[in-house]
Amino acid sequence: MRTDFVVRGVWEPDRDCLFDTRIIHAGSPGRAAQHISYQNALNTSAREKVKLYKAAAEERRATFCPLIVTVEGIAHQSLQAFLRRIAARLSAKWHKPLSTVTNWVRVRLQFALIKAVDLRTRGSRKRWRSSGFEDGEGIATLFQR
């Protein structure tokens, strides 16, 4: 089992919580043709993740939480609960109002989502250095003995 990240003590003290993320395009033409609502698309994705990971998480005596969000930024209820928990803990730690910290957490999530979607659609910002041969013909000479 390979999840995206593990955090200890999110829901219960000294108990790991396994998180797996998914960004879906709920407004895709395929879903629109089938008249699938955003909430149904989010719930279906969450059920798929739970079905895949829950047994393995329980075997490790951990909890599992799917973090599902659409490309438009609509979050599944499990992600909303996780963000509320993070905001509450940070609010207590930083001695700031909960509303201020909640807005900060949401903005950070939105920027992370924009970055993830942008990298997914456009690719990496790093330029790939080619071998210097425009047509690729010289690459064969590099690998000859």
Region spans (language model):
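Non-catalytic C-terminal interaction segments of nucleic acid-processing enzymes
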Residues: 1-3, 9-17, 23-145
